[in-house]
Amino acid sequence: MEQFEIRGLSFSYPDAAKQTLSDVSLTIKKGEYVLLCGNSGCGKTTLLRHLKSVLAPTGSRTGEILFDGVPLDKVDAKRQASAIGYVMQNPDDQIVTDKVWHELAFGLENLGVSRETIGLRVAEMSSFFGIQSWYHRDVSQLSGGQKQLLNLASIMAMQPEILILDEPTGQLDPIAASDFLNTLKKINQELGTTVLITEHRAEDIFPVADRVLVMEKGRLVANNGPRQIGQSLFDRNSPLFPMLPAPMRVFYQCAGSGQAPLTVREGRTWLTDCFREKVPTVRSLPTASQKQFGEPALRIRDVWMRYERQSPDVLKGLNMEVPAGCLYAIVGGNGAGKSSTLRTVCGATRSYRGKIEVFGREIQKYPKGKLFQNCLSMLPQDPTNLFVKQNVRAELEEMNGEEAEQLRVAELCEITHLLDAHPYDLSGGEQQRVALAKVLLTKPKLLLLDEPTKGLDCGFKARFAKTLKRLTDEGMTVVMVSHDVEFCAENADIAAMFFDGQIIASGTPREFFGSNSFYTTASNRMSRCIFENAVTAQDVAALYRENLGEKA
């Protein structure tokens, strides 16, 4: 039975030149797990928000949306609140109370549920989601993964019939993201709750999805099973092909025959079968020789930092050197201290012990404001922290008065068509690109990036990687904190692991990711039974072809 039926939905924002949604028609059946994907700005979030009246954007709309056969605008607010659960990308946008236990109960209180029922459901959700150990904690003390799990538990306490999730793992580390998606799979399979999710990082979702919907420029262009969608994207040489799980990409790049693998396990089996009769003679790629870098652009020596006098230390004797002209990527769990390191380097927080030197000079010894004049800039995790103007054009003008330079950077970040838009009307990926443009306009020598690929589609991510390479080749130094392990493996000069307030290991991507079990890529986990240090889909395909040629 259809839970949602959308008929000819078109929508445009006020004063917008083009429609954001154009004649979208689809059905979502009860109990389905559906993945919605597409490039940033293609209309995914706008479509999802139309499925809950209280979140529907303002603008011009035509078409019809039915929920359980009833027009959505005729379904009362209480029914929508309980039956349609919605999880946003940023966990902080949805949390409204200060205690975990109160957040779990808040939605039920607003629905007028009895105290006894609230107690039962809160207890049940705490057990199901493993929240008991932090049930009494302040929400402010939770990691990003815990906050997002709390959001999901709070919504599930209201026993929704469908869960709508808009890039829910965008701010989670790989392990927290995997745990979150496994919980979502359990909810769908064991409770029968319908799931509609949009996610750029589709590695863990493709194998469990019943259907995949693909949007382009506001239109629904594909609606099929995961394997059929993968074949279609490959046949069309679609820019969305890099979105596919690594085992599928390796399979198609190797001209594999038979059924494409969806999971690491299936990919490992396929690869093992390929080499069953021939032992590979070339098992590893040369460890990429490091570029010749200059003197350290950033040197951190024995730095200790805490946010409050009585609070625990966040940075614990941190030592770190970043050579000039290097792309230095830092990975690690939520709450390990990665973002705190960037904030401490740029002076937003102060260490109480140790030294931080930027280009050989302690940051405290730079004259007021000089550190940020063509020297150091930072892209924060939340791009909206940089927005203070009424449109994108004014945001860029604030950073650099030269119109030619503004247009050059706008073209580089692919935001020329957004110049007259309000920054808060943009999608998450578009906001990220605008914030990046603002930062690049300061022409820094040392660029700090906190989750720069969050919300970016695979196409722009590839172009962004080329931009970073060009900038580092020209001498800029980039320090990047990221949960995007694949992006780091493909593009970093040096990768480092952050744990418990310190850097505990670093090396070239093939050295670093080739030896990890969890903080590594799906390509590496899939191929390590055959190859030694292949960390990207391209690495696996290259070794495959070198040993077997083009034939699968």
Which residues are covered by each model-predicted region?
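ABC ATPase nucleotide-binding domains
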Residues: 235-296, 519-552
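Conserved ABC ATPase "signature" region
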Residues: 116-134, 403-418
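Catalytic Walker B motif of ABC-type/P-loop ATPase nucleotide-binding domains
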Residues: 163-166, 447-450
